[in-house]
Amino acid sequence: MIRINKNESPLRPLTEAQLTSIIHHASFNFYPDEEYERFKAGYARYYNLSPDQIIAGNGSDELIQKLMLIMPEGPALALNPDFFMYQAYADQVHRPIAFVNADNDLTFNLENILSRIETVQPAFFIMSNPHNPSGKQYNL
């Protein structure tokens, strides 16, 4: 079993020789802008998106923290339960956060979500898909 929430990887670690080769060929004196743009273009092409619709980061935590900082002023809205870092990063940047509570079977009714959006008027709504911790995949 791979515990993705613990950042476990199904891949074997690189060998010392592989790491040495990677480090030897890395250009540490330049920002990796060219590689980043190539990655975005390739990812966008694969998913039939525009590169402007793609942002990459050093894991989901970095991107969640950035969202909490750059989104318009106002509360965030998230599912409850869901990934605990939504609340942690909202608290870190003093952003209010409200929640849509799960039904007893850990599912979320779309009407309840829409009603909560209407009530809270959040700056943005954030959710994990598949849902954490139930693993339910939502068709968006």
Residue spans of the language-model regions?
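N-terminal "arm"/small-domain region of PLP-dependent enzymes with the aminotransferase-like
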Residues: 1-30, 139
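Short beta->alpha connector loops at strand-helix junctions that form conserved
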Residues: 80, 99-103
